[in-house]
């Protein structure tokens, strides 16, 4: 396919003095922050689905974008044209990673055999594109939610044949991810939930999910895939209630089926807020549980109750999230993937670049602000001081199992304990954070 973004040059860093909307003002891939480059810290990725599989349609109207590769025609030819445009975009954006679902990159076909054959051919195409451009795959996944067969889920479907079809897709998607050097494999249970309890057997569906995830783990080890397996939590939409509601729920599920050492989580900002949590809360919770894996960077609209997948633009939110990540040692195989889509009125080809450039710049600012908080360590010092008692004789004794309820009660009476509350100084810390963010 002819060059689609022919009037757009490769995006470069020009600094804060630049007013060029097609240049980075803050994201400088090789700039060192805490001894590591921005590129290594952030591990940025762009997604295939919103950028190249969506024409701007919504439930109230037809598509608003000019996407020639989505027009009617030979499905495989259109898929190859889509790959041409996608890798042109990724390369010009100067982003190091990308992510995909199986049917983003390959026609599903009219049978499972067609699906397998088409996907194998397109994996060849993607492999060649990666070699040509130097782009890497952050993660792959299988779409087990769009086709009508998955109306009641895949792993949680009441029909074992649907379960089987979904398992087949996951096997081939994981195989392709391994072949393409993917660093993670994601499972998002968009339809793994229920619409009504009137026709749902919760225990049965949970057992099915547990078996499905065990099969995924078995296949990972069978083929020697070294990447992380990631579950992406979301509370609802498209189902009324999803079984991977939030990070804590996922942890409980994994513990029940002995999988807590096999999976991490891929946290999406908009999913966190839909679950009634802050983005920072979900990241901090995942880290505290040993589940942190990767991030889908986006944002929701506070006035809307659905997944808007807008580009991240809150430096405060991003700084606090990156602070949590840096405290924990940074990403291993994960990164920041832009699971984001343009507003359907943003129909100029430049808009796709401008939106991603903004997101990359905001993450770069957040990284630098988070690094300042790490270096100043005022938050770390405040937390250490607040919990200092647990490093004393009593605190260590309690946590070390030296006391039971009766012996603690006796100690409390014998020493006539009258503990006093000490200020948490929330407002002081909020002011200090704002001083870092805004000066």
Curated annotation (Swiss-Prot):
Swiss-Prot/TrEMBL GO biological process terms: D-xylose metabolic process
Cofactor(s) annotated in UniProt: Mg(2+)
Main location: cytoplasm
Superkingdom, natural source: Bacteria
Protein keywords: Carbohydrate metabolism, Cytoplasm, Isomerase, Magnesium, Metal-binding, Xylose metabolism
EC number from the UniProt entry: 5.3.1.5
GO molecular function annotations of the record: magnesium ion binding; xylose isomerase activity
SUPFAM superfamilies with a match to the protein in the record: Xylose isomerase-like
Bound cofactor: record note: Binds 2 magnesium ions per subunit.
Subcellular localization, as worded in the UniProt entry: Cytoplasm
Reactions catalysed according to its record: alpha-D-xylose = alpha-D-xylulofuranose
Binding site for Mg(2+) 1: 232, 268, 296, 339
Similarity remark: Belongs to the xylose isomerase family.
Name of the protein described by the UniProt record: Xylose isomerase
Organism annotation: Pseudoalteromonas atlantica (strain T6c / ATCC BAA-1087)
Gene this chain is encoded by: xylA
């Amino acid at each position: 396919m002819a060059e689609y973004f022919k009037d757009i040059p490769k995006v470069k860093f020009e600094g804060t003095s630049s007013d060029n909307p097609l240049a980075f003002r803050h994201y400088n891939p090789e700039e060192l922050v805490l001894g590591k480059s921005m590129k290594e810290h952030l591990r940025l990725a762009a997604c295939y689905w919103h950028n190249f599989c969506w024409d701007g349609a919504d439930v109230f109207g037809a598509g608003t974008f000019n996407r020639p590769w989505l027009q009617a025609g030979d499905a495989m030819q259109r898929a190859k044209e889509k790959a041409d445009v996608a890798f042109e975009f990724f390369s010009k954006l100067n982003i190091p990673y990308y992510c995909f679902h199986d049917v983003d990159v390959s026609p599903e076909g009219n049978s499972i055999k067609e699906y397998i054959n088409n996907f194998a051919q397109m994996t060849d195409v993607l492999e060649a594109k990666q070699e040509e451009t130097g782009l890497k795959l952050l993660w792959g996944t299988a779409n087990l939610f769009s086709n009508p067969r998955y109306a009641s889920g895949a792993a949680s479907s009441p029909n074992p044949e649907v379960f089987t079809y979904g398992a087949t897709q996951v096997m081939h998607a994981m195989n392709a991810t391994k072949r393409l050097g993917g660093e993670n494999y994601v499972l998002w249970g968009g339809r793994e939930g229920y619409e009504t309890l009137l026709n749902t057997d919760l225990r049965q569906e949970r057992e099915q999910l547990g078996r499905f995830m065990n099969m995924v783990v078995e296949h990972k080890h069978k083929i020697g895939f070294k990447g992380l397996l990631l579950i992406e939590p979301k509370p609802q939409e498209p189902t009324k209630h999803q079984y991977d509601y939030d990070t804590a729920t996922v942890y409980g599920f994994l513990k029940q089926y002995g999988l807590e050492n096999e999976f991490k989580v891929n946290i999406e900002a908009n999913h966190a807020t839909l679950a009634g949590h802050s983005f920072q809360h979900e990241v901090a919770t995942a880290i505290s549980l040993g589940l942190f894996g990767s991030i889908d960077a986006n944002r929701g609209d506070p006035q809307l109750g659905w997944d808007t997948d807008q580009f991240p633009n809150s430096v405060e939110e991003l700084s606090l999230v990156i602070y949590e990540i840096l405290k924990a040692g940074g990403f291993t195989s994960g990164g920041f993937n832009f699971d984001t889509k343009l507003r359907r009125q943003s129909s100029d080809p430049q808009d796709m670049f401008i939106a991603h450039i903004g997101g990359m710049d905001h993450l770069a600012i957040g990284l630098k602000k988070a690094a300042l908080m790490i270096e100043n360590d005022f938050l770390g010092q405040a937390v250490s001081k607040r919990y200092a008692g647990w490093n004393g004789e009593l605190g260590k004794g309690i946590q070390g199992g030296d006391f039971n309820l009766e012996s603690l009660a006796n100690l409390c009476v014998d020493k006539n304990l009258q503990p006093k509350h000490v200020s948490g100084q929330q407002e002081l810390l909020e002011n200090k954070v704002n001083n870092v963010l805004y000066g």
